[in-house]
Amino acid sequence: MYKLVLMRHGESQWNLENRFTGWTDVDLTEVGREQARRAGELLKREGYTFDLAYASVLKRAIRTLWIALDAMDAMYTPVGLNWRLNERHYGQLQGLNKAETAAKYGDEQVLIWRRAYAIAPEPLDIDDPRHPRFDSRYAKIPAEQLPATECLRDTVARVLPFWNESIAPAIRAGRRVLVAAHGNSLRALIKHLDNISDDAIVELNIPTGQPLVYELDENLRPIRHYYLGDAAEIEAAMAAVAAQGKAKKD
């Protein structure tokens, strides 16, 4: 049996402000840093050790990983960073407040933009300074691979090559792997692992800073999965994620 641990980054500044973040490189809040520290302490207390860790190239995931590894006294763990683990790109929605956008366009439309499997928001213009082609961290990525917007289907197509070419081979080689990434890039991995339908994946809510353990068979199919930590706290965190895209009630 193999084990894989997935962890969404801790609360970011734009999580706190309820903004569409996507590929915008915002940092963790103090709460997010504490979530990462507690996650690392929990992993250490439960006896987890890792041979290899992966994160996206966005600082909220990288910092979450480093804080967690530091709390585990495991800063020596080899780390691989890859853009394919980035959050879903939200196009022109990036930077907008989710509740304000819901008040303007309706909860249903915002839910579609946030979660619909095959519907992407309006793309960034190719000359928009927010376009990833202007970011030096993506300089070696072919321009045609860099998104100006994504639906979840696009995110799955981006993430799965990294699973197939890097994460899965490492697990099959017996390496214990930790992945620190984002709500939608982790949703893409979970959809693949659990064979979740396009419709059902919309309902999956992943809380920040909570280690999610997958026990996998020899074919890397899930035997079971579970969050570490307090069940009530995790349920409350999931509910908070689900409520992010709703208009505020007077």
Swiss-Prot record:
Uppermost EC category: isomerase
Keywords tagged on the record: Gluconeogenesis, Glycolysis, Isomerase
Gene3D superfamilies in UniProt: Phosphoglycerate mutase-like
Annotated residues for binding of substrate: 8-15, 21-22, 60, 87-90, 98, 114-115, 183-184
Pfam family, one: His_Phos_1
Reactions the enzyme catalyzes: (2R)-2-phosphoglycerate = (2R)-3-phosphoglycerate
Pathway: Carbohydrate degradation; glycolysis; pyruvate from D-glyceraldehyde 3-phosphate: step 3/5
InterPro entries listed in its UniProt record: His_Pase_superF_clade-1, His_PPase_superfam, PG/BPGM_mutase_AS, Phosphogly_mut1
CDD domains: HP_PGM_like
SUPFAM superfamilies tied to this protein: Phosphoglycerate mutase-like
Site (Transition state stabilizer): 182
SMART domains: PGAM (SM00855)
GO biological process: gluconeogenesis; glycolytic process
Entry's Gene Ontology molecular function annotations: phosphoglycerate mutase activity
Recorded family membership: Belongs to the phosphoglycerate mutase family. BPG-dependent PGAM subfamily.
HAMAP family xrefs: PGAM_GpmA (MF_01039)
Function: Catalyzes the interconversion of 2-phosphoglycerate and 3-phosphoglycerate.
Name of the featured protein: 2,3-bisphosphoglycerate-dependent phosphoglycerate mutase
GN (gene name): gpmA
